Amino acid sequence: MNDETSQPFLAAVWMLGAIASFTLMAVAGRSIQAELNSFELMFWRSLVGLGVMTAVLVILRRSARAILTEIRPTRPALHLTRNLFHFAGQNLWFYGIMIIPLAQLVALEFTMPIWVALLAPLIVGERLTWVRLSVAALGFAGILIVAQPGVQVLTSGHLAGILCAIGFAMNILLTKRIMRHDSVLCVLFWMTVLQTIFALALAQWGGFTWPSPAIWPWLLVVGLTGLSAHFALSSALTCAPASTVAPMEFLRLPVIALVGVWLYSEDLEIAVFLGAGLILLANWINLNTTRYRRHKV
């Protein structure tokens, strides 16, 4: 993607769709977890996604042979590992939205690119530079401001927010390796299949709860937004470079904060925005440093 082919307005439209999807997913997740635990939620979310992906494959590939060719994974173990991390991260995210204010969770989730920078040397063989270490230190300072240890009680929700960011970072890095060999449709298909199995197995602990009709619409919402959010984000990245798209995603924080105030009477804390500002600055430095290196090469 270069400046001549970049379409920033279209990228912004796609990012608005992604932000709306992530926000709806959070609201639906809170509504569902009034009845179901996070494993049960993930089962229905993945099952809806599997239905959608199957329909897409049938429409696009038509023949059974073409579908089987499309979804045949080159490295099954890598798909399994990737989905274990993504499943853990997504469960922690849904758990976190029940424990801490939405704005705090999203601010902690924004540390994901920092974890990508730190873990990339281990997963994809990239160099760990002083710039990346400095960016990580700045990001962790932002985490401390958001969580405010010593000022407020640290909860399992704060830990869930940090760990979900690590899970999502591992997902990004492993997806990067998988995409060298397999298609997007293959990745999404196995994501929905494997995570349906994971969730169903774990949901049996303590007994599986069947959802009441009152939350069926929310289950549909969380299943559809799980796919639409990532599709919109991927589409935005095809319209403009990451350096243009990434700042747009950070609009999710004020949006989710206002939703928290409006629907759940959560407080708008200055510390959350100050800490998020440091995290976003760290991400911006990391993004532009990476972009500079690529242009230099």
Model-assigned labels for residue ranges:
Residues L10-A18, R65-L92, S156-C164, A203, ...:
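Loop-to-transmembrane-helix transition segments
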